[in-house]
């Protein structure tokens, strides 16, 4: 394997229509972003994990807790764009691997990040990676669960909110795989992604990863057995606290 420098960046914005101030939500006496940073920092492949925010309140809390952070612009259309600005401010090398770590996953399993970055050390041609896991037929039918189908070599063919693959004969066939929204990019691939216009399929499915596929940028998909649980609303905090207690136990 070739040694590859890997960095984790956590985009954290204060404004949220469903949960304003979410990164600062208290979980067992610490803000949510601290838990995400702490869990990600347990991944041995990541040389550094940094918070990327445009909000002074989040920056002040990060400073108080000794969490590395960078201040970014407030006009980014997506978290991926914020991650790219942060990577640029950190002056990362062209071949560095940048992991986009969701800021609302305080019970993140660090081994998922290890799975995510491993292909970069095994194959110099890999530009982007993500994760997927097996799901039930009921989950496959839900448009909120994004599905992915892959080539024999593990690269994504397509992501969709529809049930793919569709089993015409109603018998068991290829398993349904649900996409897990973690991404890692080589720095130059991340830069190119942010320079591309939104694609037709991206706008249709409301899935930004389709921009990569439509522009012939392959995405290596790694199967994982681990699960994540994001925080969308204040009521999700209790679930997260139970997950953190299980991890600590």
Swiss-Prot record:
It is an enzyme of class 2 (transferase). Keywords: Cytoplasm, Lipopolysaccharide biosynthesis, Nucleotidyltransferase, Transferase. GO terms for molecular function: 3-deoxy-manno-octulosonate cytidylyltransferase activity. It catalyses: 3-deoxy-alpha-D-manno-oct-2-ulosonate + CTP = CMP-3-deoxy-beta-D-manno-octulosonate + diphosphate. NCBIfam families: kdsB, PRK05450.1-3, PRK05450.1-5, PRK13368.1. Belongs to the KdsB family. GO terms for biological process: CMP-keto-3-deoxy-D-manno-octulosonic acid biosynthetic process; lipopolysaccharide biosynthetic process. This is 3-deoxy-manno-octulosonate cytidylyltransferase. The lineage of its organism: Bacteria, Pseudomonadati, Thermodesulfobacteriota, Desulfovibrionia, Desulfovibrionales. GO terms for cellular component: cytosol. PANTHER family: 3-DEOXY-MANNO-OCTULOSONATE CYTIDYLYLTRANSFERASE, 3-DEOXY-MANNO-OCTULOSONATE CYTIDYLYLTRANSFERASE, MITOCHONDRIAL. Activates KDO (a required 8-carbon sugar) for incorporation into bacterial lipopolysaccharide in Gram-negative bacteria. It comes from Oleidesulfovibrio alaskensis (strain ATCC BAA-1058 / DSM 17464 / G20) (Desulfovibrio alaskensis). Pathway: Nucleotide-sugar biosynthesis; CMP-3-deoxy-D-manno-octulosonate biosynthesis; CMP-3-deoxy-D-manno-octulosonate from 3-deoxy-D-manno-octulosonate and CTP: step 1/1; Bacterial outer membrane biogenesis; lipopolysaccharide biosynthesis. It is found in: Cytoplasm. Its EC number is 2.7.7.38. Its main location: cytoplasm. Pfam families: CTP_transf_3. It comes from the Bacteria. HAMAP family: KdsB.
